[in-house]
Amino acid sequence: MAQGNNYGQTSNGVAEESPNMLVYRKMEDVIARMQDEKNGIPIRTVKSFLSKIPSVFSGSDIVQWLIKNLTIEDPVEALHLGTLMAAHGYFFPISDHVLTLKDDGTFYRFQTPYFWPSNCWEPENTDYAVYLCKRTMQNKARLELADYEAESLARLQRAFARKWEFIFMQAEAQAKVDKKRDKIERKILDSQERAFWDVHRPVPGCVNTTEVDIKKSSRMRNPHKTRKSVYGLQNDIRSHSPTHTPTPETKPPTEDELHRQIKYWQIQLDRHRLKMSKVADSLLSYTEQYVEYDPFLVPPDPSNPWLSDDTTFWELEASKEPSQQRVKRWGFGMDEALKDPVGREQFLKFLESEFSSENLRFWLAVEDLKKRPIREVPSRVQEIWQEFLAPGAPSAINLDSKSYDKTTQNVKEPGRYTFEDAQEHIYKLMKSDSYPRFIRSSAYQELLQAKRKGRNIPIFPCHKNCTPTLRASTNLL
C-alpha cells in the first residue's frame, strides 16, 4: 500500500543538498541497529482482548536499548534522543498522534523505510485530502478522524470544492485496494501511513520536523565562505564550535590590517551605550511629558469647535494670543519653539531686544533656502552670504574656522545645503546660550503663567475676514 501512494518527492540532487540529511543519516544508522535481528530491539506480537497487536515494542525497550548500545549514562538523555527520533517519524506510538517517546509500556512500531524523511517527501494538500477522505470510508474505531483532522478535512473540502469529486474517486480506489490486503498487513500499513501524516501534518502545538532551517541551508551551500564585518574583520566565532569543520589556514594579518583592527576596537570602546532600563525611563518620561498633547488620551483644551459648541479656539486664533498649554510646550526644547510660528516670533523678539537676533535670522534664512525653487537658490545663497558671512557683513555671525572654511568652499558651488555646517554650528550655539536665556526671560515666564481669562467677544458684527460658514454658525448661537 505504501508504494501505491503517489506523494510528491523532490529530486535526489536537492536531497543531497538538504541540511537535514546529515541528521537523517545518523538517525537511520541507529534505526538499522535497532532492527538488527540479534542485537536489536525485540519485536513481538502482543495478544489483546479478542485481538492481536503485531510488530510492536515498548517505550521502555527503546530507552534501555539506547542506554546499553550508545553508551548513554543518563536515562533522561536517552529519552530525549528517542523523542527526537520519534518526532522525525522513524518509530511511532500505535495509539497516539503525538510523536513522542514515553519510558513505559506504551507500544511503538517502526516506520517503513519508504516513509522515512530522508526520501524528501513533499506531500501536497490534495494527497492529505485523499488520505482523510479514505479514512472516513473505513468504519473502524482505530481509523476515526481526530478533531483536528476533521477540521482539516472540512477546510480542504472547501478549498478543493471543484475537484472534490476526483479526490473522492481516488480515495475510493485506494480503499478498495486496501480491503484486498491481509488483515494484519493492513493494520500495520494503516498505522504507518497515519504516522507519516503525523510527521508532515502534525497535531496543533507540535513542531514540524520536516521544515528546513534557512541558516543551515545557507551554510550547506557555501561551506567555505567566511563571514566578514563591514570593517574588514574576520568573524571567527564559528571556529570555536565543536561541529565546525576547520578551514584551510589563512595568511597572517598584515600591519595595515592590524591597524584597522585596533582602530575598530577603539571605536567600539568609545561607543556610547545605554542600558535598557535607561531607555525605558527615557521613553516613559517622553510619554508623560507629551500625554496632555495627545487628543486621543486627554481631551484638548480648548475643545474642537467643529465637535462642540465652544468657540474659544477660534477666538484664540483671532487674537493671536498663544494658550498656556502651547507656551508650556516651547519649554520642552528649542525644536518645539522653532516649530511653532508664534514660538519663533516670540523667540526672535526676545533676541532682538538683546541685539543678538542675527543667529536666529541666519538659521531661518537657511531653512527657507532649502524650500526655494532650484532656479532661485544661487541668488539666495549670495544674499545670505553677503548678509551674514562676507567680510564686513551687516549681520555677521560667529563661526569657528572649520565651519567657515567649509562654507566658503561650498559657496563656490551654491546649493540648498551650502550652509549646512554653518547652520548646525549656529543651532548648537543657540541651543546652549540663546534658548536657555529665552526660557528664563521674564517675557516667557509671563506668557507661561498667564491665566486664561474669560472673554465676552461680541458675536455681531462679524469681522470682515470671517468666513460665511463661521458667520452662519455664530448666528445659530
Curated annotation (Swiss-Prot):
PANTHER family: LP21163P, REGULATOR OF G-PROTEIN SIGNALING 7. GO terms for cellular component: cell tip; cytoplasm; cytosol; dendrite; dendrite terminus; glutamatergic synapse; neuron projection; nuclear envelope. PROSITE patterns: DEP (PS50186), RGS (PS50132). Residues 255-316 form the G protein gamma domain. Palmitoylated. Ubiquitinated, leading to rapid proteasomal degradation. Interacts with GNB5, forming the RGS7-GNB5 complex. Interacts with GPR158; promotes the GTPase activator activity of the RGS7-GNB5 complex in absence of glycine, in contrast GTPase activator activity of the RGS7-GNB5 complex is inhibited in presence of glycine. Interacts with GPR179. Interacts with PKD1; this prevents rapid proteasomal degradation. Interacts with RGS7BP, leading to regulate the subcellular location of the heterodimer formed with GNB5. Interacts (phosphorylated form) with 14-3-3 protein YWHAQ. Interacts with SNAPIN. Interacts with GNAI1. Interacts with GNAO1, GNAI3 and GNAZ. It is a peripheral membrane protein. The modification Phosphothreonine is found at residue 243. InterPro entries: DEP_dom (IPR000591), G-protein_gamma-like_dom (IPR015898), GGL_sf (IPR036284), RGS (IPR016137), RGS6/7/9/11 (IPR047016), RGS6/7/9/11_DHEX_sf (IPR047017), RGS_DHEX (IPR040759), RGS_sf (IPR036305). Residues 333-448 form the RGS domain. The keyword Phosphoprotein applies. One of its GO terms (biological process) is regulation of G protein-coupled receptor signaling pathway. SMART domains: DEP (SM00049), G_gamma (SM01224), GGL (SM00224), RGS (SM00315). GO terms for molecular function: G-protein alpha-subunit binding; G-protein beta-subunit binding; GTPase activator activity. The modification Phosphoserine is found at residues 229, 241, 434. GTPase activator component of the RGS7-GNB5 complex that regulates G protein-coupled receptor signaling cascades. The RGS7-GNB5 complex acts as an inhibitor signal transduction by promoting the GTPase activity of G protein alpha subunits, such as GNAO1, thereby driving them into their inactive GDP-bound form. May play a role in synaptic vesicle exocytosis. Glycine-dependent regulation of the RGS7-GNB5 complex by GPR158 affects mood and cognition via its ability to regulate neuronal excitability in L2/L3 pyramidal neurons of the prefrontal cortex. Keywords: Cell membrane, Cytoplasm, GTPase activation, Lipoprotein, Membrane, Palmitate, Phosphoprotein, Signal transduction inhibitor, Ubl conjugation. This is Regulator of G-protein signaling 7. Residues 37-112 form the DEP domain. Brain-specific. Predominantly cerebellar granule cells. It is found in: Cytoplasm, Cytosol; Cytoplasm; Cell membrane; Membrane. It comes from the Eukaryota. Its main location: cytoplasm. Residues 236-257 are annotated as: Disordered. The keyword Membrane applies.
